[in-house]
Amino acid sequence: MIIPLKYIRLFVDAAGLSHFQDCTLPLATRDFAPPTTPLEATDFIPAMGFAVVRFAANWSGPWHASPYRQWFFMMSGSITVTAGDGIERTLNTGDAIFLDDQGTKGHLTRVKGDQEVIAVGVRVADAL
């Protein structure tokens, strides 16, 4: 059985403006960790490394692009991201976003509320 895992993609259009897109990763039932019972999992996605990131409570940053293509997985707290087109999305604990807006005006990021945010960024190759 194929089960989709939802995530948000932040991408750049031909005019250089960033936008959000709702996407899914296919999870399939597989023997992921034998001899346990099967689990739902994606195929392995090659990664170049990861970093744990802490945003202080009430942190806010200027317009910036992601320095490289990366997955961002929210471990705790909430952030609001504003794309170049003005659309905002709030990411909460457990949410995932794929940042792919290099070389542009990028996006705004701010911590929502007065609690710190912990996230894990996973860098991926420039071309998948």
Q: What are the roles of these predicted feature ranges?
A:
Residues G61-W63, V81-T82, T90, L99, ...:
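Short beta-strand His + acidic residue motifs that chelate non-heme Fe in jelly-roll/DSBH
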Residues P46-A51, Q70, M75-G77, K105:
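A generic structural signal for short beta-strands and their flanking turns/coil linkers
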Residues W71-M75, F98-D100, A119-G121:
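Active-site scaffold segments
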